[in-house]
């Protein structure tokens, strides 16, 4: 089963909940031109807002993600985990058999290729994806020439939301030459410095690196 292609550069961030994925993505986005942060789960979160009547910020702010909704008696994280995985990844292939479990990949590719009323992203653009959770998402980014930042942090063990959920199970780093480990256990400045080292080594922004010419 083939993956959709995109023209922009991709930076995927993989790590357990609470490891600092959004912090890293926001740092890259705000310190570089032509850089955008677009999660796989953007459309999922928007759908959950409509389905469950939960505010959008409850899917973005760490404390609110775990807060149990008084009506549904589940947290926003649990809602997104179940709807995104059990309902879409595992059930939607019955309707869309040609894409298998790759719906969220195709949905993001639609946006990046300008097929959902958005402007297309081209080779001058860098898109940071802060929520790489499944093997096919990792493989798709690698297949499109992107890199993966594997983020770890003490205490971020994936025990959140639905117990033992597949979205927190981890993935195999089958392309180590384009997978960059990053340990988030120091200060914010330390984290930023490590991100800069990765961006330089991976040559994501060649104009930042005179040695690349």
Predicted regions span which residues?
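Extreme N-terminal, non-catalytic leader segments
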Residues: 1-11
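ATP-dependent small-molecule kinase phosphotransfer cores
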Residues: 42-124
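ATP-dependent NMP and nucleoside kinases share a basic, alpha-helical "lid"
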Residues: 36, 107-161
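Short, hydrophobic/glycine-enriched beta-strand segments
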Residues: 9-17, 37-39
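Conserved lysine of the Walker
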Residues: 21
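Small-molecule kinase domains that catalyze NTP-dependent phosphoryl transfer to phosphate-bearing small molecules
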Residues: 14-17, 135-144, 150-213
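Post-Walker A helix-loop "phosphate-sensing" segment adjacent to the P-loop in P-loop NTPases
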Residues: 30-37
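Hydrophobic positions on the alpha1 helix immediately C-terminal to the Walker A/P-loop
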Residues: 24
């Amino acid at each position: 089963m083939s993956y959709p292609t995109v023209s922009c550069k991709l930076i995927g961030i993989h790590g357990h909940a609470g490891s600092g994925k959004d912090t890293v993505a926001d740092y890259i986005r705000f310190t570089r031109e032509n850089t955008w942060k677009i999660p796989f789960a953007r459309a999922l979160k928007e759908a959950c807002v409509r389905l469950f009547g939960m505010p959008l910020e409850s899917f973005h702010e760490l404390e609110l993600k775990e807060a149990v909704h008084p009506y549904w008696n589940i947290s926003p994280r649990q809602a997104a985990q179940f709807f995104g995985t059990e309902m879409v990844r595992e059930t939607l292939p019955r309707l869309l058999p040609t894409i298998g479990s790759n719906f969220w990949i195709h949905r993001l590719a639609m946006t990046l290729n300008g097929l959902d009323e958005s402007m297309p992203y081209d080779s001058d653009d860098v898109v940071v994806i802060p929520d790489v959770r499944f093997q096919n998402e990792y493989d798709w980014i690698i297949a499109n020439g992107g890199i993966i930042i594997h983020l770890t942090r003490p205490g971020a063990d994936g025990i959140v939301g639905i117990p033992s959920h597949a979205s927190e199970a981890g993935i195999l780093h089958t392309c180590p030459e384009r997978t960059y480990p990053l340990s988030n256990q120091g200060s914010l400045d330390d984290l930023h410095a490590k991100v800069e080292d990765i961006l330089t080594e991976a040559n994501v922004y060649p104009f930042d690196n005179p040695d690349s010419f």
